[in-house]
């Protein structure tokens, strides 16, 4: 004999007061979340929430009625794992995320291996471009070496309202802009630098060295952490390693570092204790006098070998102003030379031909939302990637003329704000 299913009225009358309260709190939070997200298409999910908390037409926890202890145990674990993954996914996207510092670009402020809890609410969380992804993995499953995300569906760029805006001097975690295309075996230097020096065909043909060339959506590009030094609308420039904004020198971070070559008198070497006192990590120091590849560079920098053609102890390492002053006081230090900016190779944009280096760069106007820049043959390379890759336009040059989305253009109005980021460890920052 079948038992009639309770009516909707009977189901609602049977709901305990505590469940009504829990549903009310959850519903209000969900509605506020939809407003914040500016996406009202998710509101029908309230019907599902009402069934979970109140009506229970769908047996969401059917497995709890099983008399099989193994089924109960397994399903409890599955339930807990699914709940945890969904919670971590939502927390990482909209509230805060854990990051590990991979390089020494902010050495002294943030050390290699440090773990950061980064607030997504500070500047407003970005809605994911690839919503179907596995939590806790950026773009590739370790060991398996396969993508940790699915490219469909793909959502356009959209950032939610936050508690504030980026300010000069802020330390910011962001997705590396030039990481849209990657040679998987050589992710650093970036693909565009490899193409500049090796050629596009050279990278694609030599898969043993460079691996497959893959495209990554914005939210799946590698995470970088730097300090903001240039704001939208600023005219940014570096002169002799000093940053200028709109023609005025800005205050340097307290622990700013530059690379130096330090030569000691014959018979002397730095001890581990001295390196620790100077704050120089093992990864950041090199004993270059023993490396053949440095011979010509050392001669060009003014270091002189002995009669046998050998150099005394010469170290290459980053130093803060405080550490540099300490080294200058060592009686057995015979010469200190700051690494020239040219040692870092060409600066952005590659192929610009103006001789810009990391020590002498610009001036460069940083694009600002709503502002217009006049496009010329001279500044085309400066704004090419921003207009084409970051703002989604079809940009090309034909017969000395510039075309945007098929129409000839002599100017462009930017849709987004742009920022200039630098590491405090200036000469060891990608």
What are these regions (language model features)?
Residues 1-430:
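Extended hydrophobic leader/signal-anchor segments used for secretion and membrane insertion
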């Amino acid at each position: 004999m079948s038992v009639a299913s309770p009516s909707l009225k009977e189901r609602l009358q049977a709901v305990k007061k505590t469940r009504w309260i829990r549903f009310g709190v959850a519903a209000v939070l969900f509605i506020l979340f939809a407003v914040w997200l500016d996406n009202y298409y998710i509101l029908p999910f309230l019907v599902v929430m009402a069934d979970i908390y109140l009506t229970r037409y769908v047996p969401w926890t059917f497995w709890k009625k099983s008399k099989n202890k193994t089924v109960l145990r397994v399903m409890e674990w599955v339930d807990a794992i699914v709940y945890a993954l969904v919670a971590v996914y939502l927390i990482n996207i909209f509230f805060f995320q854990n990051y590990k510092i991979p390089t020494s670009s902010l050495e002294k402020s943030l050390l290699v291996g440090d773990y950061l809890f980064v607030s997504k609410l500070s500047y407003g969380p970005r809605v994911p471009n690839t919503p179907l992804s596995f939590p806790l993995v950026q773009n590739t499953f370790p060991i398996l070496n396969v993508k940790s995300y699915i490219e469909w569906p793909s959502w356009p760029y959209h950032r939610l309202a936050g508690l504030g805006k980026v300010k000069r001097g802020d330390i910011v975690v962001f997705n590396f802009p030039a990481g849209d295309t990657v040679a998987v075996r050589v992710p650093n230097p970036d693909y565009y630098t490899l193409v500049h020096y090796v050629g596009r065909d050279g990278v694609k043909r030599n898969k043993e060295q460079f691996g497959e060339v893959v495209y990554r959506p914005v939210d799946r590009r590698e995470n970088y952490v730097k300090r903001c030094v240039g704001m939208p609308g600023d005219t940014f420039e570096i002169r002799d390693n000093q940053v200028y904004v709109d023609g005025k020198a800005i205050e340097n971070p307290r622990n700013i570092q530059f690379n130096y070559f330090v030569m000691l008198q014959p018979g002397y070497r730095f001890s581990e204790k001295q390196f620790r006192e100077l704050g120089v990590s093992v990864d950041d120091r090199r004993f270059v006098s023993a490396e053949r590849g440095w011979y010509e560079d050392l001669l060009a920098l003014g270091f002189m070998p002995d009669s046998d053609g050998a150099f005394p102890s010469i170290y290459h390492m980053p130093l803060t102003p405080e550490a540099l002053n300490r080294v200058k006081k060592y009686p057995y230090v015979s010469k200190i030379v700051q690494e020239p900016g040219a040692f870092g190779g060409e600066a952005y944009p590659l192929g610009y031909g103006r001789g810009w280096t990391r020590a002498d760069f610009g001036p460069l106007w940083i694009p600002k939302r709503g502002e217009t820049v006049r496009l010329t043959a001279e500044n085309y390379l400066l704004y090419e990637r921003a207009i084409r890759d970051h703002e989604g336009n079809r940009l090309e040059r034909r017969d000395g003329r510039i075309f945007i989305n098929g129409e000839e253009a002599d100017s462009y109005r930017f849709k987004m704000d742009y920022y200039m980021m630098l590491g405090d460890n200036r000469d060891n920052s990608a």
